[in-house]
Design a protein with these regions (language model features):
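Short amphipathic alpha-helical segments, especially helix-boundary/capping motifs
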Residues: 29-36, 116-123, 155-160, 187-190
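Conserved S-adenosyl-L-methionine
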Residues: 1-93, 98-111, 165-167, 173-176, ...
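Surface-exposed acidic, glycine/proline-enriched linker/cap segments
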Residues: 59, 113-132
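A general structural signal for short secondary-structure junctions and capping/turn motifs
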Residues: 79-85, 89-92, 96, 132-134, ...
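Conserved Class I SAM-dependent methyltransferase catalytic core
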Residues: 57, 126-199
């Protein structure tokens, strides 16, 4: 209901072949048309797998959006953020779950040496809280990356749709990265819904 005429930036930090980006663009265009608004949509994505990255980039080129293909980056979102100074209107992802991100962690200086501002938050007068999760599963870090790219000064703000398995709801003890990410979301009142899907 809040889609007004204007420019919207859509981001997927685990974009694969770009399918979710394409569906998001088509959905926004349809909603804008139904409301009689004129929108310009720019897609941004990052993919670590060279083959799926190439498919995504080629798909955007084939759609005739040559410059837009420059907005698809090839590297790990966790250790090599392709869009460090960007904020986005809409963000979505289906990141890998249960997949180790130890290589990224080592590349970033390890748990004690990492200084990436995407993965550290401050709560009131408390010392900084680390959002670094256990190295065996980095899915919540993809969400923390998106939270760091939210627009906070516009009326619409940002909207995030993120696909997870159930472990994101309960892993990590109090004070650990997973718990700190959930706390950050709840204390900022960013959560609108959790939708559980059936198996298969």
């Amino acid at each position: 209901d809040q889609i007004e005429s204007g420019t919207y930036l859509v981001y997927d930090g685990a974009c694969g072949t770009g399918g979710m980006l394409t569906v998001a663009e088509e959905t926004l265009q349809r909603l804008a048309q139904e409301r009689g608004t004129d929108v310009s949509i720019h897609l941004y994505g990052q993919e670590v797998n060279d083959k799926t990255y190439a498919i995504c980039k080629a798909d955007i080129l084939l759609k005739g959006a040559g410059e837009a293909a420059d907005n698809i980056k090839d590297d790990s979102t966790l250790s090599a953020d392709g869009f460090p100074a960007h904020e986005f209107d809409f963000m979505l992802s289906n990141p890998p779950y249960g997949k180790s991100w130890k290589t990224d962690l080592d590349r970033m200086g390890g748990k004690t040496g990492m200084r990436d501002p995407r993965f550290v938050v401050h709560h009131a007068d408390e010392p900084e809280c680390s959002l670094i999760t256990r190295s065996s599963d980095g899915q919540l870090l993809f969400l923390a990356n998106k939270l760091s790219k939210m627009k906070r000064t516009t009326a619409l703000g940002s909207r995030i749709a993120h696909v997870h398995n159930g472990s994101s709801l309960f892993t990590g003890d109090a004070g650990q990265g997973e718990s700190n990410i959930r706390r950050w979301i709840i204390e900022n009142d960013w959560l609108e819904a959790i939708v559980a899907l059936p198996e298969n």
